[in-house]
A protein has these predicted regions:
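Conserved "HGTGT" condensation-loop signature of ketosynthase/thiolase-family condensing enzymes
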Residues: 1-77, 113-139
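Conserved catalytic cysteine-centered active-site region
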Residues: 54-106
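Gly/Pro-rich active-site capping loops and adjacent beta-alpha segments
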Residues: 103, 107, 112-117
Length: 139
């Protein structure tokens, strides 16, 4: 198998749950980054054959296609969203390598979407009825 060239790579910022990025949707973080990577590589957005995006906390929709459009890819770009709780970004890169190796694409954007900042706060629901234990109040 031939080596798969990586023209550029970058990382979006991360923050804790409910932190500074809680109001940002994943494609809003990634689109400027992808546009910059394409510009640095000297490629127009129309050169992208596919976008493969790993997503750990999907809330519906199609984040890979939304990212492709937000980064400037015209038309209806081929896009694949992989929904996985662990290693979603790595799975996306592996899938992109397959597209390249099989000759199905020449230029692929691949990676993971940061969405943990937007994770909902989930509380454990008791399995039986009864009074809930109270935490001590402030001093």
């Amino acid at each position: 198998m031939n080596a798969m060239p990586i023209l550029a790579w970058a990382r979006t910022p991360v923050a804790p749950v409910g932190g500074a990025l809680a109001a940002c949707r994943p494609h809003e973080l990634a689109a400027p980054l992808v546009a910059r990577l394409l510009a640095d590589a000297g490629l127009p957005a129309s050169a992208v054959d596919a976008v493969v995006l790993g997503n750990a906390l999907g809330a519906g929709g199609h984040p890979a296609r939304v990212l492709a459009r937000a980064a400037g890819r015209p038309g209806r770009p081929p896009a694949i969203t992989l929904d996985s709780q662990c290693c979603a970004g790595l799975d996306a890169i592996t899938h992109a390598c397959g597209l390249l190796a099989l000759g199905q694409a020449q230029v692929v954007i691949a990676g993971g979407a940061e969405a943990w900042s937007r994770a909902p706060l989930r509380l454990h629901r008791p399995t039986q009825a009864g009074p809930a234990p109270l935490a001590p109040g402030p001093p």
